Amino acid sequence: MLIDKDLLDKVSSAAKGNERLRMNYNFHDSLDAPSQRLLNALEPGTKIPIHRHKTTSETYIILRGKMRLSFYDNDGKIIESVILCSDTENIGYNIPEGQWHTLEVLVSNTVIFEVKDGPYQPLNEDDILK
């Protein structure tokens, strides 16, 4: 399957129309697949809690747009913050298993390619930092 500007535009348009201001386009056939590969179109204002994945690392590659990726310690203090932008040298990040993180979308039409181990596991209450 070709990943082109038209596909990115389609997923971004769907994100703008979604109340959560984001939309996935999955390349895996099932939520039980051992590899979860997807486009994630994100709009400014989307809310992603500080969270972690205890059993998998997670990789983001920014295809279009700009976002801030922030990392936290167990007390909720920021330990690192990076800007990922498709027009700069910082275009991706591999987030280690168990690392608290969140992101802030800085421009409209931002799209990332996201990969993590499957099967899909919704976040548990103890995977969200309060």
Residue map of PLM features:
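Glycine- and acidic-residue-biased ligand/ion/polar-headgroup-sensing regions
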Residues: T55-D75
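Conserved short histidine dyad/triad with adjacent acidic residue
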Residues: L39-T55
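A short, N-terminal "cap"/entry segment at the start of jelly-roll beta-barrel domains
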Residues: M1-S35, S81-S86
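Short acidic-glycine-tyrosine-enriched beta hairpin
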Residues: D73-G98
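Short glycine/proline-enriched turns and hinge-like loops at secondary-structure junctions
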Residues: R52-K54, I61-I62, V105-S108
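Short beta-strand His + acidic residue motifs that chelate non-heme Fe in jelly-roll/DSBH
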Residues: I50, L69-F71, G92-I95, H101-L106, ...
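Double-stranded beta-helix
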Residues: I3, L7, V11, K77, ...
